Protein backbone atom coordinates (compact mmCIF):
# COMPACT_ATOMS: atom_id res chain seq x y z
CA UNK A 1 0.00 0.00 0.00
CA UNK A 2 1.35 3.49 -0.82
CA UNK A 3 2.20 6.25 1.60
CA UNK A 4 -0.33 8.88 2.51
CA UNK A 5 0.06 12.22 0.81
CA UNK A 6 2.54 14.52 2.57
CA UNK A 7 4.15 11.73 4.59
CA UNK A 8 7.91 11.43 4.23
CA UNK A 9 10.02 8.47 5.30
CA UNK A 10 13.06 10.73 5.86
CA UNK A 11 15.28 9.17 3.19
CA UNK A 12 14.98 11.91 0.58
CA UNK A 13 14.15 14.80 2.90
CA UNK A 14 12.88 17.87 1.07
CA UNK A 15 14.76 21.14 1.40
CA UNK A 16 11.33 22.63 2.14
CA UNK A 17 10.93 20.51 5.24
CA UNK A 18 10.58 23.63 7.35
CA UNK A 19 7.28 24.28 5.55
CA UNK A 20 5.86 20.77 5.52
CA UNK A 21 7.67 18.92 8.28
CA UNK A 22 9.36 19.36 11.60
CA UNK A 23 12.00 21.73 10.21
CA UNK A 24 14.76 19.72 11.87
CA UNK A 25 17.28 17.80 9.73
CA UNK A 26 17.42 14.07 10.26
CA UNK A 27 19.99 12.90 12.80
CA UNK A 28 22.20 11.42 10.05
CA UNK A 29 22.16 14.69 8.11
CA UNK A 30 22.84 16.74 11.23
CA UNK A 31 25.88 14.62 12.12
CA UNK A 32 27.53 15.11 8.71
CA UNK A 33 26.40 18.67 7.99
CA UNK A 34 29.37 21.00 7.55
CA UNK A 35 32.12 18.38 7.28
CA UNK A 36 33.48 15.97 4.68
CA UNK A 37 35.42 12.87 5.68
CA UNK A 38 37.82 11.22 3.21
CA UNK A 39 39.46 7.87 3.95
CA UNK A 40 42.41 6.64 1.86
CA UNK A 41 43.89 3.14 2.17
CA UNK A 42 47.34 2.40 0.70
CA UNK A 43 49.02 -1.02 0.56
CA UNK A 44 52.79 -1.26 -0.03
CA UNK A 45 55.49 -3.92 0.18
CA UNK A 46 59.15 -3.49 1.07
CA UNK A 47 60.27 -5.12 -2.21
CA UNK A 48 61.78 -8.23 -0.62
CA UNK A 49 58.62 -10.28 -0.83
CA UNK A 50 57.73 -9.66 2.80
CA UNK A 51 54.33 -8.89 4.24
CA UNK A 52 52.42 -5.99 2.68
CA UNK A 53 52.02 -2.87 4.80
CA UNK A 54 48.58 -1.24 4.83
CA UNK A 55 48.25 2.43 5.75
CA UNK A 56 44.89 4.15 6.28
CA UNK A 57 44.61 7.95 6.30
CA UNK A 58 41.45 9.82 7.29
CA UNK A 59 41.00 13.52 6.48
CA UNK A 60 38.17 15.66 7.83
CA UNK A 61 37.42 18.87 5.92
CA UNK A 62 35.28 21.67 7.36
CA UNK A 63 32.70 22.88 4.80
CA UNK A 64 30.93 25.57 6.81
CA UNK A 65 29.22 28.16 4.65
CA UNK A 66 28.28 31.60 5.86
CA UNK A 67 24.54 32.19 6.04
CA UNK A 68 22.94 35.22 4.48
CA UNK A 69 23.19 38.26 6.69
CA UNK A 70 26.19 37.02 8.64
CA UNK A 71 29.17 39.34 8.54
CA UNK A 72 32.11 37.42 7.12
CA UNK A 73 34.54 40.11 6.09
CA UNK A 74 36.65 41.94 8.69
CA UNK A 75 36.06 45.14 6.68
CA UNK A 76 32.31 44.89 7.26
CA UNK A 77 32.27 46.40 10.73
CA UNK A 78 29.20 47.98 12.33
CA UNK A 79 28.58 51.61 11.39
CA UNK A 80 26.10 53.57 13.50
CA UNK A 81 25.10 55.77 10.55
CA UNK A 82 24.52 52.89 8.14
CA UNK A 83 26.58 50.84 5.74
CA UNK A 84 26.95 53.53 3.07
CA UNK A 85 28.52 56.34 5.05
CA UNK A 86 31.92 57.92 4.67
CA UNK A 87 34.77 57.04 2.33
CA UNK A 88 35.72 53.78 4.06
CA UNK A 89 36.15 51.84 0.84
CA UNK A 90 35.82 53.95 -2.31
CA UNK A 91 37.61 57.12 -1.17
CA UNK A 92 34.80 59.13 -2.77
CA UNK A 93 32.86 61.88 -1.00
CA UNK A 94 29.63 60.92 0.72
CA UNK A 95 26.32 61.19 -1.14
CA UNK A 96 24.47 61.91 2.10
CA UNK A 97 21.90 64.74 1.81
CA UNK A 98 23.10 67.69 3.89
CA UNK A 99 20.17 70.10 3.44
CA UNK A 100 17.02 69.86 5.55
CA UNK A 101 13.80 68.95 3.73
CA UNK A 102 12.35 72.11 2.21
CA UNK A 103 15.56 73.97 2.92
CA UNK A 104 18.18 75.44 0.65
CA UNK A 105 19.49 73.45 -2.26
CA UNK A 106 22.50 73.73 -4.49
CA UNK A 107 20.14 73.01 -7.40
CA UNK A 108 18.02 76.15 -6.99
CA UNK A 109 19.46 77.55 -10.21
CA UNK A 110 17.75 74.71 -12.10
CA UNK A 111 14.36 75.07 -10.46
CA UNK A 112 14.09 78.88 -10.23
CA UNK A 113 14.67 79.07 -6.51
CA UNK A 114 15.80 82.16 -4.65
CA UNK A 115 19.14 83.53 -5.74
CA UNK A 116 22.02 83.27 -3.26
CA UNK A 117 22.56 86.28 -0.98
CA UNK A 118 24.97 88.86 -2.33
CA UNK A 119 24.69 87.80 -5.96
CA UNK A 120 23.70 91.30 -7.09
CA UNK A 121 20.30 90.35 -8.58
CA UNK A 122 17.50 92.63 -7.27
From Swiss-Prot:
<comment type="similarity">
    <text>Belongs to the SPIRAL1 family.</text>
</comment>
<feature type="region of interest" description="Disordered">
    <location>
        <begin position="1"/>
        <end position="78"/>
    </location>
</feature>
<dbReference type="GO" id="GO:0005829">
    <property type="term" value="C:cytosol"/>
</dbReference>
<keyword id="KW-0597">Phosphoprotein</keyword>
<protein>
    <recommendedName>
        <fullName>Protein SPIRAL1-like 3</fullName>
    </recommendedName>
</protein>
<keyword id="KW-0493">Microtubule</keyword>
<feature type="modified residue" description="Phosphoserine">
    <location>
        <position position="73"/>
    </location>
</feature>
<dbReference type="GO" id="GO:0043622">
    <property type="term" value="P:cortical microtubule organization"/>
</dbReference>
<feature type="compositionally biased region" description="Low complexity">
    <location>
        <begin position="32"/>
        <end position="61"/>
    </location>
</feature>
<dbReference type="InterPro" id="IPR039613">
    <property type="entry name" value="SPR1/2/3/4/5"/>
</dbReference>
<dbReference type="GO" id="GO:0005874">
    <property type="term" value="C:microtubule"/>
</dbReference>
<feature type="region of interest" description="Disordered">
    <location>
        <begin position="96"/>
        <end position="122"/>
    </location>
</feature>
<comment type="function">
    <text>Acts redundantly with SPR1 in maintaining the cortical microtubules organization essential for anisotropic cell growth.</text>
</comment>
Amino acid sequence: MGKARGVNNGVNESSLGYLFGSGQPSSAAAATMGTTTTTTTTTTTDGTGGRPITTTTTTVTDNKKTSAGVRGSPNNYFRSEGQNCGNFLTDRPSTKVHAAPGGGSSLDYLFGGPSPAGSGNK
